[in-house]
């Protein structure tokens, strides 16, 4: 049976589904790579909130902004304290033109310009200590300023080092080595109609305590007539009989049973591509080497779900007795040999569609009556 490769722009390859190309540009809450598409807007004092949580703000910065900020911070502290040293020397009379008075002791030796004060600040803060410029006992204010500079800049260096280590140690990059299939399929698993996705760990280091869950996001109208734009419903996934903590050493297929309790129970081959929903899938796991908790995310919209297909097997046994995961087959699907579940009786489908339309009309009428009663 021929396999079909599903890539980032290969949705039109599936020709058996009517309307496969419709609504392809619908908005997504989450991108395929797991990044949020929600824009936070019109929040009073949002910059103040970011400053109050400065640690998280700096860690979340991109590297180019972080490096620019830290470089600018060091240069500004050198210059600021250099200006203060220059002011102290000016007030003390160390910058008078002409020959220095024989009995005059300057606050800082060899500092007779703003450039010299800047270099003294830089040498003191970085503990270079060339030995040419040095502070004397003549000015207690200069001594106090030197102590304050070293204490303040030490705290800045501790903060910078901590944020660098925290950003490097974050398990974000580890989560990027967890691969989700680009599409999902609806097929039969153990005689039950299931929605199936495929997940793989791209590294040899194991992920322990894996938990995969899903959230169905769709518009919902309550009995009171309130319209919830992104109602969340839990979608439970299983893998074999170890649904609590699967052993993700090889690419695995996770399935969700489309039974009476499923929020996707109304899906049919005819209405799948016309539905308005987004299925967000989250995999939480603990990294074996660091014990850090990481999360990998993706989402599926109706155009990325294929009815009557199944994934091509990825794992095989080599001649020397080793298990091999062929990732060239990871994004390939093929038609399911059992076509009974998508070749259902047309009268039954028409009856189900009639009931759904009647329920929708009744809900709209209830909403209209409620709105009129509130006038």
Curated annotation (Swiss-Prot):
The record marks 157 as: Role in the control of polyamine-mediated channel gating and in the blocking by intracellular magnesium. Gene3D superfamilies: 1.10.287.70, G protein-activated inward rectifier potassium channel 1. It is found in: Membrane; Cell membrane. It holds the Pfam family IRK_C. SUPFAM superfamilies: E set domains, Voltage-gated potassium channels. Keywords: Cell membrane, Ion channel, Ion transport, Membrane, Potassium, Potassium transport, Transmembrane, Transmembrane helix, Transport, Voltage-gated channel. It comes from the Eukaryota. GO terms for cellular component: monoatomic ion channel complex; plasma membrane. Residues 88-113, 131-139 are extracellular. A motif (Selectivity filter) lies at residues 127-132. It is a multi-pass membrane protein. GO terms for molecular function: inward rectifier potassium channel activity. Residues 114-130 dip into the membrane without crossing it. Changing residue 71 to T: In a breast cancer sample; somatic mutation. Channel activity is regulated by variations of cytosolic pH; reversibly inhibited by acidic pH values. Inhibited by Ba(2+) and Cs(+) in a voltage-dependent manner. Residues 1-60, 166-375 are cytoplasmic. Inward rectifier potassium channels are characterized by a greater tendency to allow potassium to flow into the cell rather than out of it. Their voltage dependence is regulated by the concentration of extracellular potassium; as external potassium is raised, the voltage range of the channel opening shifts to more positive voltages. The inward rectification is mainly due to the blockage of outward current by internal magnesium. Belongs to the inward rectifier-type potassium channel (TC 1.A.2.1) family. KCNJ15 subfamily. Can form heteromultimeric channels with Kir5.1/KCNJ16. Interacts with PATJ. This is ATP-sensitive inward rectifier potassium channel 15. It comes from Homo sapiens. The lineage of its organism: Eukaryota, Metazoa, Chordata, Craniata, Vertebrata.
């Amino acid at each position: 049976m021929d396999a079909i490769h599903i890539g980032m722009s290969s949705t039109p390859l599936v020709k058996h589904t009517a309307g496969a190309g419709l609504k392809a540009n619908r908005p997504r809450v989450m991108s395929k790579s797991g990044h949020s598409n929600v824009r936070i807007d019109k929040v009073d004092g949002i910059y103040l909130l970011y400053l109050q949580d400065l640690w998280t703000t700096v860690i979340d910065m991109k590297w180019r902004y972080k490096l620019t900020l830290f470089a600018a911070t060091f240069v500004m502290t050198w210059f600021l304290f250099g200006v203060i040293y220059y002011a102290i020397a000016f007030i003390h009379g160390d910058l008078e033109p002409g020959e220095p008075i024989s009995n005059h002791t300057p606050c800082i030796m060899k500092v007779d310009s703003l450039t010299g004060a800047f270099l003294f600040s830089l040498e003191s803060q970085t503990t270079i200590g060339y030995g040419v410029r040095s502070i004397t006992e003549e000015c207690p204010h200069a001594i106090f300023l030197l102590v304050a500079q070293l204490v303040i800049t030490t705290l800045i260096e501790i903060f910078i080092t901590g944020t660098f280590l925290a950003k490097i140690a974050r398990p974000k990059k580890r989560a990027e080595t967890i691969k989700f299939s680009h599409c999902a399929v609806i097929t039969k698993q153990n005689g039950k109609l299931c929605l199936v996705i495929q997940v793989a760990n791209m590294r040899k280091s194991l992920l322990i305590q894996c938990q995969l869950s899903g959230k169905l996001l769709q518009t919902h109208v309550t009995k009171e007539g309130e319209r919830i734009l992104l109602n969340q419903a839990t979608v439970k996934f299983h893998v074999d009989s170890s649904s609590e903590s699967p052993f993700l050493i090889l690419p695995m297929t996770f399935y969700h049973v489309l039974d009476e309790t499923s929020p996707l129970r109304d899906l049919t081959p005819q209405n799948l591509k016309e539905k308005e929903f987004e299925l967000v899938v989250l995999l939480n796991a603990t990294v074996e080497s660091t014990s850090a908790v990481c999360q990998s995310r993706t989402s599926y919209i109706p155009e990325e779900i294929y009815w009557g297909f199944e994934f091509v097997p990825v794992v095989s046994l080599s001649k020397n007795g080793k298990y091999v995961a062929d990732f060239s087959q990871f994004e390939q699907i093929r038609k399911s040999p059992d076509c009974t579940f998508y070749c259902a009786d047309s009268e039954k489908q028409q009856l189900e569609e009639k009931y759904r339309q009647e329920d929708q009309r009744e809900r709209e009428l209830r909403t209209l009556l409620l709105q009129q009663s509130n006038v």
